[in-house]
Amino acid sequence: MTYQVSIFLENKLGHLEKVTAVLKKAEINIRSLHLNHTANGWGILNLVVSNPELAHKLLNESGMSAALREIVVVKMTDKPGGLDELLKDIVKAGVNFTNAYGRVVNEGVNAFFVIDVQDIPDDRLKLVNVGLEIISDHLVYGIQSL
């Protein structure tokens, strides 16, 4: 299973750095991030890190509001139109996602597309059934390389 850590952050100077300081101290590497503004000066930071369980624990212990959520990471080709091809397959599979972001792994070769879906087991199966490759947590976290 692959997880992201989501942190509810106030949009204030230095708040993101507080997160990165906690992770740096624990030698947790950020593999991918997505920060978006919500409302009234708040945002949600989604992180894929080398040790999500420890990051979740340490961030909460530091007084932050962090959640651990399972995600699906799909391999895509890093080329013009690569995302479009992937999205066509995701639509063909009948999978809807509520949040998404990408990360280039090998420039011009591979990228990861991180998606947040409602029914992880069912949606994973649907994606595999249309020929998409689900990336293992060891590859996502950088424990192994492609």
Residue ranges and their predicted role:
Residues 1-146:
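A conserved regulatory-domain signal marking ACT and ACT-like small-molecule sensing domains
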